[in-house]
Amino acid sequence: KLIQMKENDEGTTFVFLDETNGQIIGYCTYCASGLKKAYENDSITYPAAEIKYFAIDKTYQHKSYDDDFKFSDLMLCEVLKKLIEISEEAISFDYILLYSVPEAVNFYKRNGFCEFTEFMKKDSYNYIDGCIPMFFTL
């Protein structure tokens, strides 16, 4: 179950609850952003959403939901559905961005994200040092 908790300067945060026991499974914070693409001597920024934080309790990280999906896949799918809904109903954007820790890159690739191409410019925030910039195209 996805529950909206709060909105602040970081973005909007949602918490995932296990409905069988009320335990918090994980959380996600997303916000408005932009994807910068370089073109010769110029760059263009395209509207995007950014998943700033996506964390899952260790007991659920590799736990299967059923034979086909893991809890982590279903939770990310819920976030993507919510962002697609926002794009269609409120703020139009074509990309969802995130900065992945190296050990989670395969998880995001399995769920449709790609690493930035050579023409995409990453942000220079300190908290993303060592993280891999990735994008999902709507």
Predicted regions span which residues?
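Non-catalytic substrate-recognition and accessory regions of acyl/acetyltransferase enzymes
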Residues: 1-66, 74, 78-96, 101-138
